[in-house]
Amino acid sequence: MSGQQSSAVYKIALGIEYDGSKYYGWQRQNEVRSVQEKLEKALSQVANEPINVFCAGRTDAGVHGTGQVVHFETTALRKDAAWTLGVNANLPGDIAVRWVKTVPDDFHARFSATARRYRYIIYNHRLRPAVLAKGVTHYYEPLDAERMHRAAQCLLGENDFTSFRAVQCQSRTPWRNVMHINVTRHGPYVVVDIKANAFVHHMVRNIVGSLLEVGAHNQPESWIAELLAARDRTLAAATAKAEGLYLVAVDYPDRFDLPKPPMGPLFLAD
């Protein structure tokens, strides 16, 4: 890619969208496909120098992103079109740059973030889908989305999420602050929309797994509050599948003035 190299160092933020179904998660790892590795390779081609990216949230194998944010530093002076159209031309079809923004030195994709937002998409129908099969989680028993929504409201605010935390979670604390959790139905789709300052490992998928039990009338509405109070992962339901989970937005202080495109996923109304 033609362009100038300079003695100055530029810090660039990008919005990234990806279908995680064919990747072993976000994080670069030896001998397996990762979103980070593909993005760094494409950026390095455009920058004509090695690029390392830092992301807002490392998603697991099979999990998707419509609102992932990354930053990197480079001495390459390029037009915005090079960092969007140029990088996209070098990326696989299931990863895309959505926007680019030059950011100040004190910006960090992970540490400057004030909140993350996820959406979990359930295809609630007797028969499984074929199109979008890796972009939704199929659940065949009828679900009561309003019941799920009511049950979930006990999770609001600052709580100990041990009951919804993966055993292998490496976070120093199970405490997180949930800002909203909404469960809504859109035809055959049931959407769990949750925003928090941060998430413990598998937190969204573990919450959804238990909400499915409530929605199917296998557990009472009070069960989620009981699980939260118990602080015991073994009492909660199985972890919901990765396919339905999307990182849809990351919040930053207004002073960074980052773009805010529609959250998606694109087959859902915003």
Swiss-Prot record:
Q: What CDD domains has UniProt attached to this entry?
A: PseudoU_synth_EcTruA
The record's Gene3D superfamilies line, in alphabetical order, gives: Pseudouridine synthase I, catalytic domain, C-terminal subdomain (3.30.70.660), Pseudouridine synthase I, catalytic domain, N-terminal subdomain (3.30.70.580)
Active site, renumbered: 60
Q: Which GO terms describe its molecular function?
A: pseudouridine synthase activity; RNA binding; tRNA pseudouridine(38-40) synthase activity
- The answer to whether UniProt assigns keyword Electron transport to this entry is no
Q: What are its GO biological-process terms?
A: tRNA pseudouridine synthesis
Q: Which reaction does it catalyse?
A: uridine(38/39/40) in tRNA = pseudouridine(38/39/40) in tRNA
Q: Which UniProt keywords apply?
A: Isomerase, tRNA processing
Record field: transmembrane: none
The catalytic activity of this protein is classed by the Enzyme Commission as 5.4.99.12
Which is an annotated Pfam family here? Answer: PseudoU_synth_1
Going by the record, the broad EC class of this enzyme is isomerase
Database matches in SUPFAM superfamilies: Pseudouridine synthase
Domain of life of the native organism: Bacteria
Query: What residues does substrate bind to?
Result: 118
What's the stated role of this polypeptide? Formation of pseudouridine at positions 38, 39 and 40 in the anticodon stem and loop of transfer RNAs.
Per UniProt, subunit arrangement is: Homodimer.
Q: Which family does it belong to?
A: Belongs to the tRNA pseudouridine synthase TruA family.
Name the UniProt record assigns to this protein: tRNA pseudouridine synthase A
Task: Report the source organism.
Answer: Salmonella typhimurium (strain LT2 / SGSC1412 / ATCC 700720)
